[in-house]
Design a protein with these regions (language model features):
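Short, polar/flexible loop-turn hinges at active-site or ligand-entry regions and domain interfaces
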Residues: 90-94, 113-118
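Amphipathic, soluble alpha/beta structural segments
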Residues: 124-143, 231-234, 254, 292-299
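Extracellular low-complexity, Gly/Ser/Thr-rich intrinsically disordered linkers
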Residues: 277-340
Length: 354
């Protein structure tokens, strides 16, 4: 087996500033209002879904489904990504590199009709009237928009949800504590897994870069933040499924077929299933795909050898990994788990005790 060179980038020591969310909301009435709106089912067209339906605290603000379910009961195209730590991202969408801000991103889940997600009506007089008449919401809107002529508007709903989401920061994992003070030590298995993660052989960190183990907030270059990992190669014709081709949908360039946003690995133990389409059930399956240099499917409509897709990222070459090494790597990934946010009311459903 080749000797692995352990590379630990300096940037892993540089963490984004993170203040306690309780402190932030105390001085940010829009975030307080946004907290309630995020968990409010009335913002969906039939009052069946909220933002939290697809981004639940229990699953690190994902939903546990292969593909999320819309307010009208249909499966959406993609797996719900975590929205923890996304305020500094340059990219937000699985396959649309033109979405650079939360203000742009929020419009699709709120208003889209084809397909419907929440299906909120931009001019929903009944929803805005409810906010105005409800004692809780009228008080919260008054605090957030006192003095404005039009307190109750779809624009303000967007703005407050964004303020809430911007403060959903989770960087208190065992790994973070180990780096921060050295008072918490990684165990032998976690340390060996970290060595593998940053090695030149596996190259995990080349795409999943600290501090948040993604390129979405460390690079504003599309080719750095999006990649084809050799998941599909329909009929060996260098194609992904026609309904979900990746960046090619927007750019109309064949070289972008199969490229999707590289997700964060923070809390990855809580966010299964994996990939843009939720097709990978667990980390063991995922590592098998990477170690093989992509996925080969032998039968069915998706059959083809993703390992040979012409757009596959050059780092996805495959590697040898033993069962014990795989276990160690998963132990390291587990050290990126932070559930301390579950003790912070700001992250939880404010209606849970009502």
């Amino acid at each position: 087996m080749k000797k692995m060179v352990f590379l630990f980038p300096v940037c892993v020591l540089i963490f984004l500033e993170c203040r306690d969310s309780r402190e932030l909301t105390a001085e940010n009435p829009k975030a307080i209002l946004g907290h309630y709106l995020f968990f409010e089912k009335r913002i969906s067209f039939n009052h069946s879904k909220s933002c939290a339906s697809c981004h639940s605290p229990e699953y690190a603000f994902t939903d546990g489904y292969r593909k999320s379910v819309s307010a009208d009961g249909n499966n959406l195209l993609h797996n719900a990504p975590s929205i923890l730590n996304i305020a500094q991202n340059h990219f937000f969408d699985w396959d649309n590199p033109e979405i650079h801000t939360l203000s742009q991103q929020i419009k699709r889940p709120l208003y889209n009709k084809h397909p419907t997600e929440l299906g909120m009506d931009l001019d929903s007089s009944s929803l805005l009237s409810f906010f105005k008449k409800d004692s809780l919401y009228s008080s919260l809107f008054e605090r957030a928009y006192r003095g404005e002529n039009e307190m109750y508007s779809a624009k303000h709903v967007e703005e407050c949800i964004i303020e809430y989401v911007k403060n959903l920061n989770s960087r208190n994992s065992k790994f973070d504590q180990h780096l921060d003070s050295k008072a918490v030590r990684l165990n032998k298995s976690e340390e060996e897994g970290m060595r593998l993660f940053f090695s030149t052989e596996l190259k995990c960190s080349q795409c999943h870069a600290p501090p948040d183990f993604t390129k979405s907030n460390t690079s504003n270059m599309v080719d750095s933040a999006y990649a084809n990992i050799g998941l599909y190669n329909i009929a060996n014709e260098n194609k992904y499924p026609a309904e979900d081709v990746g960046l090619n949908k927007i750019t109309k360039k064949l070289r972008d077929d199969g490229k999707f946003k590289i997700p964060s690995l923070r809390n990855v133990m809580l966010t299964a299933p994996y990939m843009h389409d939720g097709s990978v059930r667990n980390l063991d399956e995922l590592l098998n795909i990477y170690s093989a240099g992509g996925q080969s499917i032998n039968k069915g409509p998706l059959s083809g050898d993703g390992r040979k897709h012409r757009n596959k990222h050059p780092h996805i070459k495959g590697f040898e990994i033993s069962d014990s090494q795989k276990k160690n790597l998963i132990c390291f990934l587990s050290s990126l788990t932070d559930t301390t946010y579950l003790s912070n009311p700001y992250f939880l459903n404010p209606f849970r005790n009502k």
